[in-house]
């Protein structure tokens, strides 16, 4: 499992239907983390649980002394999780990336839901 984390003051994911102006909010978070998650073939429940634990406990927020010493949980922050299969892209040869390092859609959905549940 590949997880890319971004500290955010706020973040949201919206969907806009083709030809429409209105956006439909799908998820949002205030101060906390935006987690882009990519499942890889064979991700075990242990790997997924470890990734979720690491996300929740990673001390990347400043404490009162300005040191990165607090986790998202410590600051009462949330985590907005976005499935992002492109993190598995292999661009080592040619001009077209290969996504063979990513899990199948069914396996990825299962891993994504397990990650969210473990958070």
Predicted segments — roles?
Residues 1-94, 110-119:
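N-terminal, polar/charged subdomain of small-to-medium soluble alpha/beta proteins
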């Amino acid at each position: 499992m590949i997880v890319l984390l971004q500290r955010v003051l706020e973040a949201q994911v919206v969907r806009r239907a083709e030809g429409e102006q209105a956006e439909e909010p799908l998820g949002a978070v205030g101060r906390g983390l935006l987690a882009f998650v990519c499942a890889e073939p064979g991700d075990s429940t242990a790997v997924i649980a470890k990734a979720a634990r690491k996300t929740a406990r990673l001390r990347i927020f400043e404490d009162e002394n300005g040191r990165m010493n607090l986790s998202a949980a410590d600051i009462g922050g949330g985590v907005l999780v976005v499935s992002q299969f492109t993190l598995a892209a292999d661009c080592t040869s040619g001009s077209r990336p290969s996504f063979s390092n990513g899990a199948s859609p069914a396996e990825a959905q299962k891993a994504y839901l397990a990650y969210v549940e473990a958070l």
